[in-house]
Amino acid sequence: MMAPYTDPLPAGGDGTASSLPLVPSPRLPGRADERPSLDDQPETVPFVKTDPEAFIRANTDVMSLPHVPEIRLHLASEAHDLWLKTEEELEEIGLPPPFWAFAWAGGQGLARHILDHPELVKGKRVIDFASGSGLVAIAAMKAGAASVLAVDIDPWTQTAIRLNSELNGVTVAFAAADIIGDARSADVYLAGDVFYDKAFADRLVPWFTALAERGAAVLVGDPGRAYCPRDRMQMLSTYQVPVTRALEDSEVKKTTVWRFPAYFPQSGSI
């Protein structure tokens, strides 16, 4: 069931969307292509046994990204055993799989494209879907967006995005919710690296298509995931993004930025 939403956003004292319930994150059994879909989620929020801010500060380093050096993030590195923790160890400390601790290739490519083409977001209301570390949301704010709402189902990402936003001198609002299917008052929707699961992609494609048909710009960064609907989108740019072999099957991923068109002819149409 999707979380309720009211528009405009009711902001909390820190600028976050305070009325939305928290929803737990998917499991991270291995590499990015193996991440399961939102359909597998339990209905209750895992009990947070560890203070998120203290944990993030103790288990990450502040790094500039190789493909987006303008932005610094709190990220896991080989110096921290966050790379090595099993699912059981993460559960023991009350930590959902830490997608927010890594700069995925799709997000890096999309962030690069936004910074290189600020006219796409300048003065506009932006939603960064499945925000993770907040990389793409931060890039949109740096490029001049009027406002950015970062959305993710993992409650830990709220703290990660706040810390990363502060590092970069921008303010990003946050909502912990599954918003797939919602129609919101946003001009631009951004999504980095979201087509890793078939069931998830099957939910996203009609939603993204409907948003584009209503006039929103829908941009996706994808490093060649198995369920990316390439035949349904327009290619905008391609990058060679440095990544870590611990997460991917190579040290560089060819990453493409795509846009869902407002209208895409069906097979046999004129």
For every predicted segment, state its role.
Residues 2-9, 20-22, 34-270:
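S-adenosylmethionine-dependent methyltransferases
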Residues 13-14, 30-31:
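Glycine-biased, low-complexity coil/linker segments
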